Curated annotation (Swiss-Prot):
Domain of life, per lineage: Bacteria
One GO term of the biological process aspect: queuosine biosynthetic process
Gene name of the record: queC
Cofactor binding mode and count: Binds 1 zinc ion per subunit.
GO molecular function, one term: ligase activity, forming carbon-nitrogen bonds
Uppermost EC category: ligase
Assigned EC number: 6.3.4.20
Organism (species): Coxiella burnetii (strain RSA 493 / Nine Mile phase I)
Binding site for Zn(2+): C188, C198, C201, C204
Cofactor(s) demanded: Zn(2+)
Pathway membership, UniProt: Purine metabolism; 7-cyano-7-deazaguanine biosynthesis
Residues that, per the record, bind ATP: I8, S9, G10, G11, L12, D13, S14, T15, T16, C17, L18
Name recorded for this polypeptide: 7-cyano-7-deazaguanine synthase
Length: 226
């Protein structure tokens, strides 16, 4: 069976991405990162999601990039703001995060002799992060072609972003068609230890908007009624 490494955070998009990988018949290897994020409950969710989808193997790689600061998701001196629209790159952007994550996933994929890496990046209904754009995925694909044994031998590892052109509503509809239970997921940047969401950060607002537009009941549990 063909193998794939799937990056999972515990959130809505990456969980949908894992469901897509399963639907394609991949033998799935799930990879998460403990990078010093404040919303640590997403990793608790990710572990449960990996077990729910019966992945072949689930790994959590610990990184110390949070010590460098520079993002409201990792730096205790910076507050996660309420939703502010997508006019500029927000303070919740973690510098080079997807590049770091994909690089480690690429190494694991080589070790596993996997055909693909799947990431839940989307350039629609997103927070404006530069490493969630189609041109970024294309650039990393070029890197994978040039910098791996498989790539040099003509069997490059494919970098797949199946949600890249989907709105949040379209992603949710896709996930529901594949049987995803979104009540298991944690998307909030300010989620508490129980995984309850704040309802007001970028991620929460985009998630609420997605369920509303998809006309599907939002199963998210919030700290206070929103």
């Amino acid at each position: 069976m063909k193998k794939a490494v799937i990056l999972i955070s515990g959130g809505l998009d990456s969980t949908t991405c894992l469901a897509v990988a399963k639907s394609k018949g991949f033998s799935c290897y799930a990879l998460s990162f403990d990078y010093g994020q404040k919303h640590h409950s997403e990793l608790v969710a990710a572990e449960k999601i990996a077990a729910h989808f019966n992945v072949v193997r689930y790994e959590v790689v610990t990184l110390s990039i949070g010590k460098l600061g520079g993002s409201a998701l990792t730096d205790n001196s910076l507050d996660v703001p309420d939703y502010g629209g997508n006019e500029s790159i927000p303070i919740t952007y973690v510098p080079a995060r997807n590049t770091i994550f994909l690089s480690i996933a690429l190494g694991w994929a080589e070790i596993l002799d996997a055909e693909s890496i799947l990431i839940g990046a989307s350039a629609i209904d997103y927070s404006g992060y530069p490493d969630c754009r189609p041109e970024y995925i294309a650039a990393f694909q070029n890197l994978a072609n040039l910098a791996t044994k498989r790539g040099i031998e003509g069997h490059s590892i494919k970098i797949e972003a199946p949600l890249i052109h989907l709105s949040k509503a379209e992603t949710i509809k896709l996930g529901y068609s594949l049987g995803v239970d979104y009540s298991m997921t944690v998307s909030c940047y300010r989620a508490n230890e129980e995984g309850l969401a704040c309802g007001y950060c970028d991620s929460c607002e985009l998630r609420k908007k997605g369920f509303k537009e998809a006309e599907i009941k939002d199963p998210t549990q919030y700290i206070t009624k929103v």
